[in-house]
Amino acid sequence: MKVLYLGCFCEPTISTFIKECTKGVITVSATTFQKALLAGCNECGIRPDYIVNVPDIGSFPFRCNNLFFSKSKFEYASIKGVNASFFNVTYLKKCSIYHTIMREAKLWLNKNREEKVTILVYSLIYPYLKAAIDLKKMYPNVQICCIVLDLPEYFGDSTSLLYRFLGNLETKRIYSLVPSVDSFVLLTKYMREKLNVGLRPSLLLEGIYNPVCIVPQKKRKKTILDFYRFDLTD
């Protein structure tokens, strides 16, 4: 069996460029998790065979100066991959991401038609999950496993009425896709019920620990304030 990883992280070859063109704070949680996940897979010798990646960045013009991101090849944790090209325009971005994922994934899947393939999708982000499911319909040798760290109704934090309206519509579209997912990696057991996992295979993931990142510290003497030593009546 082969594994195609469908991700959305800022891998090292593009991280500097993304920092330069991003307005405001860069969200790093998705990138941190995925880099740790892929590095861990490499250490365990069970790494994916290929990565199709569309980095998680803000949209033009409000959160990013860049209108278009070009295609580029990279290698991370001994895994070869491609940063797919896409238009980074607000509201058009998701459609562009869907089509570019389809294009890049088909190039790889066409070379692996004789193999069983699992598409490992990071998160329930609509264009990524929609692309994976449509690829499954096109290739009978494909199954889908989705990593779920958050539920779609909690995506984003905008108070805009339009944003919330569109977000609610997209949440419903995402949940309509979930029955087509074959297996799950879940952050909590409560997600099983919410996603109606049923008898489908699922794995609970409590977190990722990297001992290399832990810096040893010297033990220090602790000073404990003892309130009973004070006369509070003065």
Placement of each model-derived feature along the sequence:
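Nucleotide-sugar donor phosphate/pyrophosphate-binding loop at the beta->alpha transition
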Residues: 29, 143, 153-176, 211
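Conserved donor-binding/catalytic core segment of Leloir-type glycosyltransferases
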Residues: 4-6, 218-234
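Donor nucleotide-sugar binding/catalytic pocket of nucleotide-sugar-dependent glycosyltransferases
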Residues: 171-217, 227
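A conserved catalytic-core segment of Leloir-type glycosyltransferases
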Residues: 50-116
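Short N-terminal targeting/anchoring amphipathic segment
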Residues: 107-128, 140-145
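Active-site proximal beta-strand in glycosyltransferases
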Residues: 2-7, 118-120, 135-156, 184
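N-terminal subdomain of nucleotide-sugar transferases
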Residues: 1-69, 114-115, 183
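Membrane-proximal helix-turn-helix segments that form the acceptor-binding/catalytic region
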Residues: 35-39, 134-138, 152, 164-184
